[in-house]
Amino acid sequence: MKRRTFLAMSLALTFLPSVALADNIPVRVGYIADYWGTSITAIASEKGLWEKHGLDADTRVFTNGPIQVQALGAGSLDFGYIGPGALWLPASGKAKIVAINSVGFSDRVIAQEGFKSMADLKGKKIGVPEGTSGDMLLRLALGKAGMKLDDVQVIKMDPSTVVSAFASKQIDAAGIWYPLIGTIKEHVPGMVELAANSDFFPDKTFPSAFIARNEIVAENPEAVKRMIAVIEEAEDFRTANPEQSVDITAKFLKVDKANLETEAKNGKSLTSEELVKLTRDGSVNGWLSGMADMFVTFGKLKSPLDPKDYYLADYFTAK
């Protein structure tokens, strides 16, 4: 009898992993191939957090946030990552924010050697990925200098094209970010930085965020809860282990970690506990409202939603 009991238990244990796997929810998760855009995804993959929290993640790389929002709208992506410059999209109802990722200081307005101020860029060619944090910083920096977009020649291009165009001197300046700026410096060591996110902090806070397809929030809230659990645990690991997080992200992206180290220093990682507190005291909604106000000023939005209507604060603070 004891032998039969043992065999029955053994068979039950044998089938447990299959049952757990069957319970996993498949999700398609987007990321951007830089430190702040990849680190949570990389940590979750390296540390087995997807499986731990019951998700079967299909991770997909994108060049920017707006393209991910398009993919969400098309139903080909469930969750994604966006930088500050794309926050106007959830503010217009095109996605829901499930969690804040970090506060960023990676963006710069850079120029060729010899330029000394934003005023020097009048009439010059400036490359910028439209709808990104680089785009937003460019607008802020021009405004601070008493200038408008019409005072310069804005050339819309994807991030990789900005790098090659700047290196070949096809453009005079760019609104772009680290680690791409590090790559540019290798080819144009005399380039100068004319503006940075930190020039506008704390009045203007540049958060990046994780977003979800509107339909998955409505139809599969359990998937959203599990995704947030993954993000929170990965955020805690990243904040406690910054150097190891760079190593993990470099391994995931198959790049030299030196390319990510500078970018990692140009941002602030927050623990899940800190983000819960900042959510409950209204700070996060304040950041999002501040961003929305800028988007209205820049003509990106006319009537932004209230952050409570697109940031899933109740999901994030639920314990």
From Swiss-Prot:
Q: Name one Pfam family in it.
A: NMT1
Report the subcellular localization: Periplasm
Domain of life of the source: Bacteria
- Endpoints of the signal sequence: 1-22
Entries under SUPFAM superfamilies matching the protein? Periplasmic binding protein-like II
Listed A to Z, the keywords are: Periplasm, Signal, Transport
One GO MF annotation is: ATPase-coupled transmembrane transporter activity
Annotated Gene Ontology cellular components are: membrane; periplasmic space
The function of this protein is:
Probably part of an ABC transporter complex.
The record's note on quaternary structure and interaction partners says: The complex is composed of two ATP-binding proteins (BAB2_1147), two transmembrane proteins (BAB2_1148) and a solute-binding protein (BAB2_1146).
Family listed: Belongs to the bacterial solute-binding protein SsuA/TauA family.
Query: What is the designated name of this protein?
Result: Putative binding protein BAB2_1146
This chain's source organism reads Brucella abortus (strain 2308)
Supply the source organism's classification.
Answer: Bacteria, Pseudomonadati, Pseudomonadota, Alphaproteobacteria, Hyphomicrobiales
